[in-house]
Amino acid sequence: MQVLVRDNNVDQALRALKKKMQREGIFREMKMRGHYEKPSEKRAREKAEAVRRARKLARKRAQREGLIGGRPGAR
């Protein structure tokens, strides 16, 4: 991963690097690899994440179709 340092502005380059790493999911991966995760725990975690994603998608679809309201005062 590369970040350009312009005009010796290291702080700006560090912020850009952190943003890229966050977008790529590197911090999350480092956290997950910090300790061993049993295969059964991994399956359970992935299944829970899939359920969470499906619920979020269903909620967004329902909001888009007008079945449920969004945030209060959003309209």
UniProtKB/Swiss-Prot annotation:
Keywords: Ribonucleoprotein, Ribosomal protein. This is Small ribosomal subunit protein bS21. The keyword Chloroplast does not apply. GO terms for cellular component: ribonucleoprotein complex; ribosome. GO terms for biological process: translation. Belongs to the bacterial ribosomal protein bS21 family. It holds the Pfam family Ribosomal_S21. One of its GO terms (molecular function) is structural constituent of ribosome. InterPro entries: Ribosomal_bS21, Ribosomal_bS21_CS, Ribosomal_bS21_sf. Residues 53-62 have a biased composition (Basic residues). Residues 52-75 are annotated as: Disordered.
